[in-house]
């Protein structure tokens, strides 16, 4: 059952329509009553007038693939706690919502349904929007946006043009990751274990002319600026990004490729982290699928190379780099000259070297690199050890040696250690003019072309006379055509937009001659790399965002979303932010000051999936237990970064607690505004300690512990009402009002109703965080539990400083204890002052 707002025929609305009995907790009645009140009061719309300090809280916006699921329920409950807490603390909070609404699933659905992707997309958005409203997310709905709206992607195209003008968007021919099922290109980050991240099909290589963003120009800054995020982002996310960027210090070494009868001499540069091992190079390898291989191969070897390249196309990157696979390759007929010793090295083309990493060529040192050694063994190439590590000769063992050691067989480098040999080798290369120190990165430029329809069109026109011509700003957005739908969108290996002849054929903006639009669309990660900026002023028409407002809100103070976005979205968003800053449009250097990764929602220890049949329908859970009970369960079940196993939690238990908390309001008999100072001291101490503890815990995202403290306060308040000072005590009102405010972060419907019952106008969301009194945090007494033979027989209020002897005396004097002993003697008394006395009868 899907998550739906209450309707006239819905179960929840029907229950709400029947007025609940007085004093009966009805989540359905509350869910029917309060949403319209919140909307009318614009409770969650920030003033944005500078009257209060601003805070920006953002959840990673969803993709509209059907209705909300359990993962959405957890993630958005977490983000909402942060937004509601900051609002209670007096900040002007921006907490917007929108949809990442371009993408392949919509296109596939349109093909299946003979429809336009927008129909499926916006229908799902409407469904999810209604569900979010039922789920009581404290979002400012006036800022809602969708990346597939022309009003949004106009500015995505505008930003692309600014990148293009700075040389950060460019086209090149290169082997790219190709999904043979979706018939589209994939970025490196979208290939997981050699397969398409989306559909799981093994990825192949294909040579295409594609658009790229030059993210490598920002590699150093992306790496260095992580220092600003240390302690505010999860360490594992920072580690994943550092590894993906992959900074390596080493050297560029230039090898001369000898001329042949029909090939001129040329120079090829390689990057190596171990220039000290140059004397161990016994052959040279270029990526078989690189243009360099075609440039180098002799006519005699050409056909063999071409046949080999066809085989390489069918291999994934993971397969090509595997150490388990037998090495393959083709001799090019050429030789490279080692710049240090003049030795001729045969040049091979092989699949284990990648065209788009480094320069696409390597010097092979088989004694000290396992893949080089495996290749040498396969093709009978020499193996020369130049590093004495104390291990056996790799030529004999078949196991390469690496790491520390003393250089040998290395001319003037003999006897040097690794730390001495690397700078010495670089110095020699620099003197010879054949190399220099260089920093390389694993990170490669961001491939953004996609051969699909439902994405942002690339705002470039191709003219036979003028070449690439950006679409003028006043002609943006380049809108997607409306007349392509259904089967016309099916993947054919070229962009579906090519079939929209009237759309494609245009005049060149420069010369007026016949020209064609670019028919690729942008990777949808482009859309999500700047959406957080648009939320600041989503209706602004003079630019991507209002320059008068953007620096008031950015950077995002708290970003919430899954760790699966650690490399793709988060790295791209950081890149975009830095470029936009360099353009001079914003001051922020990083998009997200703090990051919270919520765990997964599992069922029976496994991720929910249709194939396993272990999915849990969120709508059914909401109908059965209520929104507040589900939200509270999500938050209380574990620390936010840990997984929640729905099989092990109890939304029914949460519902019972909420009913207990709500009933406190029915019992309070004092008037609003009564002075709590005259109230029960013990309850006031619990209340003020809860307020103080909750604030500190919330500041550290320990939401589950806050709920535990809240439960203790509810129990203490009930005890005071039933067996202590009574419902009229001012301390009871103070406690219940604190319960309502703290509860509003987790269970907004129940909290609002409780606040209303206490005589306050809506909304509790703006009540303000209660102030604690430090004097009340010092406990005058503590409760000592007295047990007789392991059973609790009495509780004594005693000084925190009571001695063991004094506590023993009080316990033995207790009438309840004497009654339990029933005249028996005492074998022993165990005292743990000030909390416990255990009496063991004789």
UniProtKB/Swiss-Prot annotation:
The keyword DNA damage does not apply. Its EC number is 6.1.1.4. The keyword Protein biosynthesis applies. PROSITE patterns: AA_TRNA_LIGASE_I. GO terms for cellular component: cytosol. InterPro entries: aa-tRNA-synth_I_CS (IPR001412), aa-tRNA-synth_Ia (IPR002300), Leu-tRNA-ligase (IPR002302), Leu_tRNA-synth_edit (IPR025709), M/V/L/I-tRNA-synth_anticd-bd (IPR013155), Methionyl/Leucyl_tRNA_Synth (IPR015413), Rossmann-like_a/b/a_fold (IPR014729), tRNAsynth_Ia_anticodon-bd (IPR009080). It catalyses: tRNA(Leu) + L-leucine + ATP = L-leucyl-tRNA(Leu) + AMP + diphosphate. Belongs to the class-I aminoacyl-tRNA synthetase family. This is Leucine--tRNA ligase. It comes from Paenarthrobacter aurescens (strain TC1). The lineage of its organism: Bacteria, Bacillati, Actinomycetota, Actinomycetes, Micrococcales. The gene is leuS.
């Amino acid at each position: 059952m899907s998550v739906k707002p209450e309707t006239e025929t819905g179960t929840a609305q029907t229950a709400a329509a029947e007025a609940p009995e007085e004093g009966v907790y009805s989540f359905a009645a509350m869910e029917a009553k309060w949403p319209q009140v919140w909307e009318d009061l614009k409770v969650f719309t920030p003033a944005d007038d500078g009257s209060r300090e601003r805070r920006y809280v953002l959840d990673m916006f969803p993709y509209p693939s059907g209705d909300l699921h359990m993962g959405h329920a957890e993630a958005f409950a977490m983000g909402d706690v942060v937004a509601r807490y900051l609002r209670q603390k007096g900040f002007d909070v921006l907490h917007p919502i929108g949809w990442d609404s371009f993408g392949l699933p919509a296109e596939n659905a349109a093909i299946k349904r003979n429809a336009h992707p927008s129909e499926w997309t916006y229908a799902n958005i409407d469904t999810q929007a209604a569900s979010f409203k039922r789920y009581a997310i404290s979002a400012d709905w006036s800022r809602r946006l969708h990346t597939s709206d022309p009003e949004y992607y106009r500015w995505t195209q505008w930003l692309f043009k600014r990148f293009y003008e700075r040389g950060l968007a460019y086209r090149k021919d290169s082997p790219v990751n190709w999904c043979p099922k979706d018939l589209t290109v994939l970025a490196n980050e979208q290939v997981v274990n050699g397969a398409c991240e989306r559909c799981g099909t093994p990825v192949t290589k294909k040579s295409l002319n594609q658009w790229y963003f030059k993210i490598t120009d920002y590699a150093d800054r992306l790496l260095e600026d992580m220092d600003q995020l240390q302690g505010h982002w999860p360490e594992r996310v920072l580690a994943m990004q550092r590894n993906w960027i992959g900074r390596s210090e080493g050297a560029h070494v230039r090898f001369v490729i000898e001329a042949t009868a029909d090939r001129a001499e040329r120079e090829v540069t390689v990057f190596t982290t171990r220039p000290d091992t140059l004397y161990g190079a016994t052959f040279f390898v270029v990526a078989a699928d690189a243009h360099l291989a075609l440039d180098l191969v002799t006519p005699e070897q050409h056909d063999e190379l071409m046949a080999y390249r066809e085989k390489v196309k069918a291999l994934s990157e993971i397969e090509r780099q595997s150490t388990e696979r037998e090495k393959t390759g083709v001799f090019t007929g050429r030789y490279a000259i080692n710049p240090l010793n003049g030795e001729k090295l045969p040049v091979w083309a092989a699949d284990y070297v990648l065209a788009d990493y480094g320069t696409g060529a390597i010097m092979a040192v088989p004694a000290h690199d396992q893949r080089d050694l495996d290749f040498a063994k396969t093709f009978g190439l020499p193996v020369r050890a130049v590093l004495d590590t104390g291990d056996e000769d790799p030529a004999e063992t078949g196991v390469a040696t690496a790491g520390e050691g003393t250089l040998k067989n290395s001319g003037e480098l003999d006897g040097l250690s690794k730390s001495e040999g690397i700078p010495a080798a670089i110095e020699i290369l620099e003197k010879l003019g054949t190399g220099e120190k260089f920093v390389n990165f694993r990170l490669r430029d961001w491939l953004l072309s996609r051969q699909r329809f439902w994405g942002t069109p690339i705002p470039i026109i191709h003219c036979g006379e003028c070449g690439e011509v950006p679409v003028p700003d006043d002609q943006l957005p380049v809108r997607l055509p409306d007349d392509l739908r259904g089967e016309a969108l099916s993947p054919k290996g070229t962009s579906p937009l090519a079939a929209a002849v009237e759309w494609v054929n245009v005049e060149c903006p420069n010369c007026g001659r016949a020209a064609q639009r670019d028919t690729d669309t942008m990777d949808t990660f482009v859309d999500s790399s700047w959406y957080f900026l648009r939320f600041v002023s989503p209706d602004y028409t003079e630019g991507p965002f209002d320059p008068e407002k953007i620096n008031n809100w950015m950077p995002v103070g708290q970003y919430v979303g899954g760790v699966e976005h650690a490399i793709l979205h988060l790295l791209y968003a950081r890149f975009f932010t830095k470029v936009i800053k360099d353009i001079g449009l914003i001051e922020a250097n990083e998009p997200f000051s703090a990051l919270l990764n919520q765990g997964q929602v599992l069922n029976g220890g496994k991720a929910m999936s249709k194939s396993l049949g272990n999915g849990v329908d969120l709508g059914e859970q909401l109908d059965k237990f209520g929104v507040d009970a589900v939200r509270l369960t999500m938050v209380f079940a574990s620390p936010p970064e840990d997984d929640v196993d729905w099989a092990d939690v109890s939304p029914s238990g949460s519902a019972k607690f909420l009913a207990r908390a709500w009933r406190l309001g029915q019992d309070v008999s004092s008037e609003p505004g009564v002075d709590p100072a005259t109230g029960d001291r013990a309850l006031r101490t619990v209340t003020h300690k809860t307020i103080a503890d909750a604030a500190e815990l919330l500041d550290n995202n320990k939401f589950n512990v806050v709920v535990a403290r809240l439960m203790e306060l509810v129990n203490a308040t009930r005890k005071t009402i039933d067996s202590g000072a009574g419902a009229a005590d001012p301390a009871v009102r103070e406690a219940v009002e604190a319960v309502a405010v703290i509860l509003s972060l987790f269970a907004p419907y129940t909290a609002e109703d409780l606040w209303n019952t206490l005589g306050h106008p809506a909304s509790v969301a703006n009540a303000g965080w209660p102030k604690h009194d430090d004097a009340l945090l010092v406990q005058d007494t503590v409760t000592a539990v007295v047990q007789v033979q392991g059973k609790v027989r009495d509780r004594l209020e005693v000084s925190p400083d009571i001695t063991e002897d004094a506590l023993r005396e009080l316990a033995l004097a207790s009438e309840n204890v004497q009654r339990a002993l029933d005249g028996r003697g005492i074998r022993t008394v165990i005292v743990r002052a000030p909390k416990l006395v255990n009496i063991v009868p004789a």
